[in-house]
Amino acid sequence: MRPQKTKILAILKGSTPVLLKKYGVTRIGIFGSVARDDASEESDVDIVYEMSRPNLFTVVHLKAELENILHCSVDLVRYRERMNPFLKKRIENEGVYV
């Protein structure tokens, strides 16, 4: 089943308080094919997030939890001031936050 933008955003919105408490996620949204309503059956969900205390251990657990609640594969990208300019521009143009 192809990921649907409205469903993904609703799930993320409902999960935000838990993600903040467990992982320190301060902002979360989607970008890419799902945000553009252009996803296919094989599409993963590109998730952009900001986190108060980022570390690899926390990000691995966040990814696993998001895949569990969304029932699909996710790619996580932490938004920050210093990042790949092309990717940053894509996120700024396509990003839909909850």
Predicted stretch roles:
Residues D46-Y49:
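Short beta-strand->loop micro-motif that forms the acidic, two-metal-ion catalytic signature
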Residues I30:
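Conserved histidines in hydrophobic membrane contexts and catalytic metal-binding motifs
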Residues M1-R27, A35-E41, M51-V98:
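Catalytic core of pol beta-like nucleotidyltransferases
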